[in-house]
Amino acid sequence: MERVLINDTTLRDGEQSPGVAFRTSEKVAIAEALYAAGITAMEVGTPAMGDEEIARIQLVRRQLPDATLMTWCRMNALEIRQSADLGIDWVDISIPASDKLRQYKLREPLAVLLERLAMFIHLAHTLGLKVCIGCEDASRASGQTLRAIAEVAQNAPAARLRYADTVGLLDPFTTAAQISALRDVWSGEIEMHAHNDLGMATANTLAAVSAGATSVNTTVLGLGERAGNAAAWKPSALGLERCLGVETGVHFSALPALCQRVAEAAQRAIDPQQPLVGELVFTHESGVHVAALLRDSESYQSIAPSLMGRSYRLVLGKHSGRQAVNGVFDQMGYHLNAAQINQLLPAIRRFAENWKRSPKDYELVAIYDELCGESALRARG
């Protein structure tokens, strides 16, 4: 089976989310949790941030000697040397690919930047680093510019090109066409870096792989600037395996704990319907669905909850039917007759409407006691 590398950037791009700032202990713990989940390649920081960030990167390196670690650098000799001194495996050297960024960010012509790029690739090689060229804002760059960058990278040589949809403007069809065009002029590795401004980062990531990308950037919980990055720890990784038939090496059962760790460190809530890891994604209420699930657990689930170390859960609410009421109470040790089910169902529906949620087990017991228990029988007597 073909393998695609997940190069997670939670600790670099993910931490660029407004308000997200990991302590040293959190950064190390997240790196360890990523590694335990089978995500062994990660972009761990930016040396340009200063001594504290450098110390954090150094500690991650010490704790994970077998992980494949990358730093993000500008075209700057000091930052590249700092990365080498830290024992990092890869350096991503960023170059503004679009006319807009070159004009307003660096104010230098492409020809000058390409000369410098070749020099910095050579420097990184002499320091024992593998080189990825980060084509920043590639989705707004011309094909001619990307070909020129690829030619310099090929001759230097660099090992990987990162295609960054920096402002998240791509759709899957354009992504596939762009990566395919890049593959025509570049024989090395291609890494897709997708942002989620239009809600298509995961789809664009899969499209890139289908067109020839060999690695993808991801973040836990989809953290990142603006609308975030591709959350490949969940739908992207599983989508790569299920939809494209490629191997990622991700241990999916470890992902809920990883997500919880990052959520706590980032002070972000996990949406209850977040794919794969949300509290409600393996929870069923609808009467038709529950009736089928009670007979066959795969009838309304394409993903086995056990893959994530979880199990499916039945709850009662406004859309529940009689079989669901009977099934849930049976799991609680209550064996209902038809008359009791008919009494309970409207009360459960009223509860859901009034409280805007499903009743918890103890609340179901209270409803049962009120309507069907011995006290209710005595009241009627």
Swiss-Prot record:
PANTHER family found in the cross-reference section: HOMOCITRATE SYNTHASE, ISOPROPYLMALATE_HOMOCITRATE_CITRAMALATE SYNTHASE FAMILY PROTEIN
Known EC number: 2.3.3.14
One example GO MF annotation: homocitrate synthase activity
Family (UniProt): Belongs to the alpha-IPM synthase/homocitrate synthase family.
Record keywords: Nitrogen fixation, Transferase
Organism: Klebsiella pneumoniae
Gene from which this protein is expressed: nifV
InterPro entries documented for this protein: AIPM/Hcit_synth_CS, Aldolase_TIM, LeuA/HCS_post-cat, NifV/FrbC, PYR_CT
Designated name of the protein: Homocitrate synthase
Glycosyltransferase is among the record's keywords: no
Catalyses which reaction(s): acetyl-CoA + 2-oxoglutarate + H2O = (2R)-homocitrate + CoA + H(+)
GO terms under biological process: biosynthetic process; carboxylic acid metabolic process; nitrogen fixation
Residues of the Pyruvate carboxyltransferase domain: 4-256
Enzyme class: transferase
Biological function: This protein is a Fe-Mo-cofactor biosynthetic component.
